[in-house]
């Protein structure tokens, strides 16, 4: 399924027409957070995390896509929403490295990524989201479609994974019956809300599981959404609300 999803994302389609001064486009956005190698030494450095230097909730965009990945930061420190991570992942989710302050932004595994790269595509960069329990420390929207007045955006899928910090906390504190769930809510401008979810970790009498492979999160049932918000829900309060995201794919149509 992963290969099918990637091929669908690579098949970028665009249709444009001019009719009495109007302009329309329909295409598939494939957000990988990957940049030219020249960008990394300046903006990321070695094994680091990028937080936008401005105080705007809008956060950052990728390439030409009208999608804003929201963040709330104070003094350069992420308080809620998205950051971009250049941190190398743990090897096959074995938590071999000593615990450190970067674990909140380090993917739990590099499994399936060629050359030890962190993302599912063998690239250097992925996004990390923090669901701060304090609403005042969260952006207004987690992902906002910039052309909502002139078009539509339908999220299709993305890859998700746990961070190293979350994996450690799950293994330290989870007991039978505990579950960690990621929810995505799509909201139209008229207030209509739809929701999809995926389990990031679950402990049962039969099996204990913690996600440590990049896994497809099917978001297609959200339908067109002007805003997408994420919630990381844990039955155990000792597990913080972080998760990794990459390969965000959405179908976009705009008319001007």
Where do the PLM segments sit?
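Short coil-to-beta strand junction motifs in C2/discoidin
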Residues: 169-182
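Residues that line or immediately flank small-molecule/substrate-binding pockets and catalytic motifs
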Residues: 8, 157, 162, 232, ...
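Solvent-exposed strand-to-loop "edge" motifs in beta-rich extracellular domains
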Residues: 38, 148-152, 159-166, 175, ...
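Bacterial Sec-dependent N-terminal signal peptides
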Residues: 1-5, 14-41, 252-256
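N-terminal targeting leaders for non-cytosolic proteins
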Residues: 24-139
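Short beta-strands within extracellular/lumenal beta-sheet-rich domains
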Residues: 131-154
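Terminal, low-complexity interaction segments
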Residues: 182-256
